[in-house]
């Protein structure tokens, strides 16, 4: 009998971490940091993903229940002082079909989630929150003209964004909540160093219409042409609860 509640917590990580599936260049350092993309030079075109090993039931076709969930994590993105490119390309938290794999051609601004042949297709069945540290119309024409937090549904072109000035080497704390009754997804990012925070909310995000019943959750990241650029997750908490959908349609 599966419980309607699920939660897990990683205060830190260990090499060859149990309960985490590593894809591409993702790994855990001896310092207990989840390194989503390649660390050793060159990091150019590195892609990595780290997923919680157990699939999570996000809705139930029999009972009609849809999960509310919350996740919190701390991360750092950093490049070397002599790096000529400012921020390439970013980190994302995502939900995707269980046992999902990295698509071919999804490095750089595609975050290891999408590629040109599948972008915007409902068959992707992906919801992601991207922390995009690079913008440039030449390479990423879908992006707004600023570094940002974006909520993505089946496409690298975000449905909602808010400006966020990426800070090289600084810890960022993130809280993401989804409320099933209101179908609202809210993202809050704050910098403990000075308390600055940004919030973005998307309404009418219908998990049942977008995702399969069972999903994998985790992190993905991509690097473009930067020779040395790191995406590090320091800690991660996740909890979900299947509940009867109270909203009437």
UniProtKB/Swiss-Prot annotation:
SUPFAM superfamilies: Concanavalin A-like lectins/glucanases. Pfam families: Lectin_legB (PF00139). It comes from the Eukaryota. Glycans are attached at residues 118, 245. The keyword Manganese applies. Ca(2+) binds at residues 132, 134, 140, 145. PROSITE patterns: LECTIN_LEGUME_ALPHA, LECTIN_LEGUME_BETA. Mn(2+) binds at residues 130, 132, 145, 148. Keywords: Calcium, Glycoprotein, Lectin, Manganese, Metal-binding. PANTHER family: CONCANAVALIN A-LIKE LECTIN FAMILY PROTEIN, LECTIN. Belongs to the leguminous lectin family. Di-N-acetylchitobiose specific lectin. This is Anti-H(O) lectin 2. It comes from Ulex europaeus (Furze).
């Amino acid at each position: 009998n599966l419980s309607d509640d699920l939660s897990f917590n990683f205060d830190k990580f260990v090499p060859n971490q149990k309960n985490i599936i590593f894809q591409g260049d993702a790994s855990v350092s001896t310092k207990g940091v989840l390194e989503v993309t390649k660390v050793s030079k060159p990091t150019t075109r590195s892609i990595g993903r780290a997923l919680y090993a157990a699939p999570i039931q996000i809705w139930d076709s029999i009972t009609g229940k849809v999960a509310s969930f919350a996740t919190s994590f701390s991360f750092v993105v950093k490049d070397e002082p002599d790096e000529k490119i400012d921020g390439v390309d970013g980190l994302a938290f995502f939900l995707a079909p269980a046992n999902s794999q990295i698509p071919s051609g999804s490095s750089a601004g595609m975050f290891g989630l999408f590629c040109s042949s599948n972008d915007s297709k409902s068959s992707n069945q992906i919801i992601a929150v991207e922390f995009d540290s690079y913008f440039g119309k030449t390479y990423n024409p879908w992006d707004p003209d600023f570094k940002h937090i974006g909520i993505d549904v089946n496409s690298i072109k975000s449905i909602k964004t808010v400006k966020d000035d990426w800070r090289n080497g600084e810890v960022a704390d993130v809280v993401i909540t989804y409320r099933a009754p209101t179908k609202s997804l809210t993202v809050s990012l704050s910098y403990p160093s000075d308390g600055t925070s940004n919030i973005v909310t998307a309404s009418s995000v219908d998990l049942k219409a977008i995702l399969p019943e069972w999903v994998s959750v985790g992190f993905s990241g991509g690097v473009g042409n930067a020779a040395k650029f790191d995406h590090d997750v320091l800690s991660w908490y996740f909890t979900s609860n299947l509940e009867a959908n109270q909203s009437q349609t």
